[in-house]
């Protein structure tokens, strides 16, 4: 579980134990810490390219600033430090292997004061790192025992909500950056040793009628009933609101982000397909069935997605035209570091505009965030 750095904090793969490092150690790319665009991390793109997406890029940038502020105020209910926030972000960035993110979060982590070298602090950081890595790389394995481990090392409900939002956000950020890099024709730069995410086991999806319920977190913040009922939260967030309200600013920005991405010319059917594929890969049965119950026009595809991955591969071989969208969503979900220009070109060849393609694939990245929130913060029966 523990990954050790060769040169202090200067290497992406930070260790989970505190140590004393030389004061002159620098990150691999120190300038990567300083960016004007807190979400796309100064990826060079013409303004006219980004213009159609500013409605959701703006809340995404505000989320980056909110999740990683210059100063973090801690108290009894909010103990997740600036170091733990940035360490979690770097762990997730490492999982997805998008170099721009790894450089940025490594550079920002370097100057932060780490926890003390006590066994308790080391154990807490190790648990946080392991949890972040697992939820990012294989969300289906997360369950009640993992939540208990986090509680045992002192994470409060607010801490837990915040950490899961950070993990979801950085995953969305990694996929969006990979998407725009592919649009720009950047070559794929793979980091050796990173595995592609596997499909969750098909047996989980045998149950077509399921109920998601929130895990029994101690509730530290109760939303006013009138305010809660009046707020127009998206359907995808309704069940999560009693927990996500612990970070109300983040919840409101996530709501704005979801609504903005959905306000595009992409068809409802395409959005549903992307949501189904991501939830099938990530193992979120609750998200999958919620989509399945409303996507009546996708009955055949839904039945196919409930089967083993090999059945889907056979279907794709027989339907090369129809599988183009599936392939793009799959690669962005399973291996954003390998998402290439060729996958976007295949969508364009089917008559999908660049604006539609980017909105659709950004939505699939958001779905991955929502899948992880549902898995991390509750259980499905």
What function would you assign to each model-found segment?
Residues 1-381:
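Hydrophobic alpha-helical segments
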């Amino acid at each position: 579980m523990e990954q050790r750095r060769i040169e202090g904090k200067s290497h992406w793969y930070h260790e989970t134990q505190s140590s004393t490092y030389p004061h002159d150690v620098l990150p691999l790319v120190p300038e990567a810490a300083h960016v004007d665009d807190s979400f796309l991390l100064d990826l060079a793109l013409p303004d006219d390219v980004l213009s159609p997406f500013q409605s959701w890029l703006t809340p995404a940038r505000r989320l980056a600033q909110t999740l990683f502020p210059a100063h973090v105020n801690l108290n009894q209910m909010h103990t997740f430090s600036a170091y733990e926030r940035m360490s979690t972000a770097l762990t997730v960035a490492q999982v997805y292997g998008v170099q721009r993110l790894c450089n940025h979060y490594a550079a920002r982590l370097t100057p932060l004061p780490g926890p003390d070298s006590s066994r308790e602090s080391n154990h807490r950081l190790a648990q946080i790192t392991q949890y972040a890595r697992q939820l990012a790389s294989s969300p289906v394995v997360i369950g009640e025992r993992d939540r208990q481990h986090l509680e045992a090392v002192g994470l409060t409900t607010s801490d837990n909500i915040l950490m899961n939002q950070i993990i979801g956000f950085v995953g969305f950020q990694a996929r969006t950056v990979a998407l725009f890099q592919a649009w720009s024709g950047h070559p794929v730069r793979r980091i050796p040793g990173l595995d592609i995410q596997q499909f969750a086991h098909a047996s989980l999806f045998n149950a077509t009628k399921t109920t998601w319920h929130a895990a029994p977190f101690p509730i530290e913040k109760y939303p006013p009933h009138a305010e809660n009922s009046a707020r127009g939260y998206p359907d995808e967030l309704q069940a999560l609101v009693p927990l996500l309200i612990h970070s109300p600013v983040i919840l409101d920005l996530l709501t704005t982000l979801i609504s903005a991405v959905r306000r595009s010319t992409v068809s409802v059917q395409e959005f549903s397909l992307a949501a189904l594929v991501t939830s099938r890969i990530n193992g979120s049965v609750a998200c999958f069935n919620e989509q399945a119950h409303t996507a009546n026009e996708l009955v055949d595809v839904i039945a196919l997605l409930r089967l083993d991955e090999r059945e889907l591969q056979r279907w794709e071989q027989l339907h090369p035209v129809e599988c183009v969208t599936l392939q793009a969503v799959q690669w962005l979900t399973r291996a954003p570091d390998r998402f290439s220009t060729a996958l976007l070109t295949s969508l364009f060849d089917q008559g999908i505009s660049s604006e539609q393609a980017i909105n659709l694939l950004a939505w699939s990245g958001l779905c991955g965030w929502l899948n992880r929130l549902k898995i991390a913060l509750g259980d499905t029966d």
